[in-house]
């Protein structure tokens, strides 16, 4: 739903919250956690909202630039974001015991949509071209070869603490 990403976005990052409890009760105290993969779907929704006129183009570019700038500062592991981040800080929020590093699948969900944004705005005005360039840089910094671990496969996760212990080939 477009409103989840537009109205409900975490204010510092502009990304989608992992969850929203309408009653305001967060037993895990995780109300500031943002989801990388879910934000990818949300970014695609923002782009559709801009194209269809639900979001004014300049406001959409401003939000997408906020997201790109945040992602540049946020924790990354060989260019790949973790499954979750703490929205206010951009620091990794572990998804599980050994899942405290790069999550290639979730990052690719996000990057797919960001690449659509890049293509959509690449020939636009000065701000739009700058946004497209920021996204292009983020994409180029994703070290897919690192996630091969020297093998003929790509792995889902890598952790600076646990290395390849999860070892899920894609």
Show which residues each predicted segment covers.
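Aromatic- and histidine-enriched alpha-helix N-cap/loop-to-helix transition segments
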Residues: 33-44, 102-112, 167-170
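Low-complexity, Ser/Thr/Pro/Gly-enriched N-terminal "stalk/linker" regions
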Residues: 1-31, 78
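Extended ligand-binding clefts on enzyme/binding-domain cores
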Residues: 79-107, 123-170
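Sec/Tat-exported extracytoplasmic proteins
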Residues: 9-12, 46, 75, 118-121, ...
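Hydrophobic core segments within long, regular secondary-structure runs in both alpha-
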Residues: 2-6, 43, 61-72, 111, ...
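Well-ordered alpha-helical scaffold segments within catalytic/enzyme domains
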Residues: 3, 40-55, 70, 109-124
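Surface-exposed patches in mature extracellular/periplasmic domains of secreted proteins
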Residues: 12-18, 54-60, 124-131
């Amino acid at each position: 739903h477009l409103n989840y990403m537009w109205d409900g976005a975490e204010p510092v990052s502009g990304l989608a919250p992992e969850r929203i409890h309408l009653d305001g009760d967060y037993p895990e105290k995780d109300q500031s956690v943002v989801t990388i993969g879910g934000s990818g779907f949300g970014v695609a929704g923002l782009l559709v909202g801009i194209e269809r006129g639900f979001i004014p183009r300049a406001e959409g570019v401003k939000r997408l630039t906020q997201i790109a700038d945040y992602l540049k500062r946020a924790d990354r592991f060989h260019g790949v974001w973790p499954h979750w981040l703490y929205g206010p800080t951009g620091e990794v929020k572990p998804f599980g015991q050994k899942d405290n590093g790069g999550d290639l699948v979730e990052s690719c969900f996000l990057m797919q949509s960001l690449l659509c944004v890049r293509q959509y705005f690449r020939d636009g005005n000065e701000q739009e071209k700058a946004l497209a360039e920021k996204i292009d840089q983020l994409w180029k910094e994703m070290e897919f070869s690192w996630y091969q671990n020297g093998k003929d496969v790509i792995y889902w996760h890598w952790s600076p603490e646990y290395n390849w212990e999860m070892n899920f080939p894609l």
